[in-house]
Structure formats: structure tokens, C-alpha cells
Design a protein with these regions (language model features):
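Domain-level signal for Mg2+-assisted phosphodiester chemistry and nucleotide/NA-binding surfaces
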Residues: 2-132
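Nuclease catalytic cores that cleave nucleic-acid phosphodiester bonds
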Residues: 103-239
């Protein structure tokens, strides 16, 4: 091809270009809608301490929560949220945050592997000192998922100092927020106008046997204090 022919061909090229395609309404409807998450964050150190407080000792493996039952509960919660948002893909995400004390890796490994085997992601952090807890990591993960799109949030913890304010702020944006724990230790969640509380023992199958929680039908001979379900200050607020 001569230089003249090449120039002529390049001038004619724009005329041969096809017009840009126009995306039809039918084409738009074929796109996957934005996904949302139902996120579960489990504060393992805090809930382990709470369970130990109820039992009066360190819980055994058989006394710990069954995460397969918790996973089924989360799937049911995700289906419930999805039913209220037709056309939106809602996916569950189950996470456990824990500390690994020096020398305990071999003891904790079977538990971590069991969690991963039933679909839970585990964030493990060395327990070096008192400042190496996982509170910041849980809040950072929640913030990350919120920026990506949260359909609902479930936090299993009794740590009101760390969680109450950020969870209530998320709830005020319209995201349903639930707190899971033991009612004896979660008065801050019970008293909140924006958070829903679920007692861990009310989730079917989570515990193999009923917990030895003190009630009127199981009082020790020397008597016992029955703690309030919520603080007295809750009388100053009205639940909507």
C-alpha cells in the first residue's frame, strides 16, 4: 500500500465505525443488583468471660456455644432481611474475633478449625498485653462493611463501652442492628431505643444443656441477687 492509499484509508476509517450501542431497559435489568450483607461479629473473649461468669468457672468444650446452630440462625435472619428487600442480593457473613494467648495455639486450633469448617471467618490476634484486645479490629471491620453496604448487623458482645455508641449510630442510619449476649450482662442493649437484643440462650440449639442461670425456681439455699434486666435510667426513655 502506498502512502497515498494509506492516508485515504485512514480518512475513510471513521465512516466505517459502528455507532455506539445503546443499552436498553431490558439490558439494564439483566445487571446484578448491588449486594448487601447481614454481618455477624462475635466477640469471643467477651462472651467467653460472660459464659464463665454464669457457670462460675471456665466453660468446657461441651458447654460452649454451638456455632453450627448460630450459623443456621444467621441464615434465617438473612432470609428475613432479604424478604423485605426484593431484587437485592443479600449475603450473610459470619465472623469471630479472638485473642491467642502465648502458648495456647495448639489448644485453640481445633476450635478455630471447627469454626472455619462451618463457614465462619476467624480474626485471630496475639494476646501480647492488655492493649492487644480485638475491640478496634471488630469496629474497623464493621466500618469497612458499612461503607460497602450493610443490610443488617448483629454483634455478639456485652461490651457496651466499646459498642453502644457506634452501634446506635449505625442503627440511626436505618440499618437494623441486633445485639446477642446474656441479658444479665447487656443492660445497655436492653435499654437502648435503637438496638434489638437477643438472648443467646433463646437461639435454638446454641447450648446443649440449659445454662445454670439463677431464677426463682433455682435459688441457692443462701439466696441470691437477681440483677435488673435494664438500668433504672431506662425509665427516662420511651421505647418507640
Amino acid at each position: 500500500m502506498s502512502l497515498t492509499e494509506e492516508a485515504t484509508a485512514s480518512e475513510a476509517a471513521p465512516e466505517s465505525l459502528a455507532a455506539p450501542a445503546v443499552l436498553s431497559a431490558e439490558g439494564l435489568s439483566s445487571f446484578q443488583p448491588p449486594a448487601g450483607r447481614v454481618l455477624l461479629v462475635w466477640d469471643a473473649p467477651n462472651l467467653d468471660m460472660g459464659l464463665g461468669s454464669i457457670l462460675g468457672r471456665r466453660p468446657t468444650a461441651l458447654e460452649r456455644p454451638r456455632f453450627d446452630a448460630l450459623g443456621r440462625w444467621l441464615l434465617a435472619r438473612t432470609a428475613e432481611v432479604s424478604s423485605g428487600r426484593p431484587g437485592v442480593v443479600i449475603e450473610p457473613e459470619a465472623t469471630v474475633f479472638t485473642n491467642i494467648a502465648p502458648g495456647s495455639a495448639d489448644v485453640v486450633r481445633p476450635w478455630v478449625d471447627a469454626l472455619r469448617n462451618v463457614g465462619f471467618a476467624v480474626f485471630a490476634k496475639p494476646k501480647i498485653d492488655e492493649d492487644s484486645d480485638v475491640d478496634h479490629d471488630m469496629l474497623a471491620h464493621i466500618a469497612r462493611r458499612q461503607s460497602e453496604g450493610l443490610a443488617a448487623l448483629v454483634v455478639a458482645s456485652a461490651d457496651g463501652q466499646a459498642f453502644r455508641q457506634p452501634l446506635e449510630e449505625i442503627a440511626r442510619t436505618g440499618v437494623p442492628v441486633q445485639v446477642i449476649g446474656f441479658r444479665e450482662h447487656a443492660s445497655w442493649a436492653l435499654a437502648s431505643d435503637t438496638l434489638d437484643f437477643v438472648d443467646l440462650e433463646d437461639i435454638a440449639g446454641v447450648f446443649r444443656e440449659p445454662l445454670p442461670r439463677i431464677g426463682l425456681d433455682s435459688l441457692p439455699d443462701h439466696g441470691a441477687w437477681l440483677q435488673p434486666f435494664r438500668p433504672l435510667s431506662a425509665l427516662l426513655t420511651t421505647r418507640v
